[in-house]
Every structure is written in C-alpha cells, then in structure tokens.
Swiss-Prot record:
Belongs to the LOR family. This is Protein LURP-one-related 6. It comes from the Eukaryota. Might be related to the phospholipid scramblase and tubby-like superfamily of membrane tethered transcription factors. The lineage of its organism: Eukaryota, Viridiplantae, Streptophyta, Embryophyta, Tracheophyta. InterPro entries: LOR, LOR_sf, Tubby-like_C. Gene3D superfamilies: LURP1-related. Pfam families: LOR (PF04525).
Length: 191
C-alpha cells in the first residue's frame, strides 16, 4: 500500500497498537495510541479540546499536527444522503493538502447502503469499513478486499481497545479513519 499521510508511519511488519480513550472531564476527550512498548505514537483531539464541533486533529508523539479532519457542512451537505468528512495533511510549506474523504451514510429511508467508504486521492483508490466500530469489531478493507487494519476488543475494558495494522500500511491514515469513526458513533472525540 502506498503511504497516504506519510511513509514515516508505514512499517514492514504487522503491528498491534493500543488505543486508550481519554475522559471528557479531565482531558477534553479524544484518545491516545501507543505501541507494544507503551510509547505514545499518536494523540487524537476532538471538539472537547479544540472547541469546534465536527473537527478532529491527529498529532504525532511530539504534538505536531499530522491530519486535520473536519465534517463538511452547508446546504449541499444537508441535502446529501451521506455525511462527508475530509482529512488534510500539511505539505512542507505548511499548506493543507487533501488526503482522504470519508462518506458516512446518514440514517434515512433514502439511504441505499450502510457502508462507510473512504476515498484516497484521484482515481479509484478506496477503502470500506466492515463491521461495527462500537462493538470493537471492524476492519478497514481496501478495494481488492484485503484487510489493512482491524479494530479488536480489549477484554474487560470499554475504554481500551487494540488495532492491528498490516505491513506497509500508513498508521496515520488508519487512525485518522478511526478518529472519524469514534466521532460518528458519539464516543471520546465527539461533543
């Protein structure tokens, strides 16, 4: 898989990452991602920290912004059968660069599909979310049907779960998608 955000976050081997939700009361919500050595890899902040509804930021372990993700609004969006989220990274000059678009079907009688689809770049590169995120039982699958990442339940805890990423998968992209799923389902990044 080609890097979506940065090749710095691609690994040559499968990795298991641990996600810990932060309480809204103490840290404004969001979550922290650690590796198997319990070293922080990513931090995700939502509106509890940012103060803006429908906006998320994925940061690296040093606090540098990697992805700005926001929910599209406006009249056209209100008439659409999908909620649309856009993820932006920053180029070397600090300008935002579009990275992905996630389409989440609105709950209505007009919705034909319940699949969450992520489009990356120009062309036909897309991913689907299969399964149900709130149950910690879902996968991100590429257009060929290959699982690139899996969200799995951590036994005994609702606030901790694990994410398994396959080799050469951009983990920053994966956790950008997971941040949106967290928000969509009203969890730690939502208001």
């Amino acid at each position: 898989m080609k890097a979506v955000v940065s090749k710095l976050y691609c690994s040559s081997m499968e990795e298991v990452m641990v996600v810990r939700r932060r309480p809204h009361v103490v840290n404004g919500g969001g979550f922290v991602v650690t590796d198997y050595k319990e070293k922080i890899v990513f931090k995700i902040d939502g509106c509890g920290v940012l103060g803006t509804k429908g906006e998320l930021v994925l940061r690296d372990s040093d606090g540098n912004d990697l992805l700005l993700i926001h929910k599209k609004g406006g009249v056209v969006q209100a008439l659409s059968i999908h909620n649309k989220w856009k993820g932006y990274s920053y180029d070397y000059q600090g300008s935002p660069k579009p990275v992905f678009t996630l389409r989440d079907p609105k709950h209505s009688c007009f919705s034909i599909t319940s699949s969450i689809r992520i489009s990356v770049g120009p062309g036909n590169c897309y991913f689907d979310v299969k399964g149900y995120f709130p149950d910690r039982d879902c996968s991100i699958v590429d257009s060929k049907g290959n699982v690139i990442a899996q969200v799995k339940e951590w036994i005994g805890s609702r606030d901790i779960y694990k994410v398994v990423t396959k080799p050469s998968v951009d983990k920053a992209f994966v956790f950008g998608v997971i941040a949106v799923l967290d928000y969509i389902y009203g969890e730690s990044t939502s208001c």
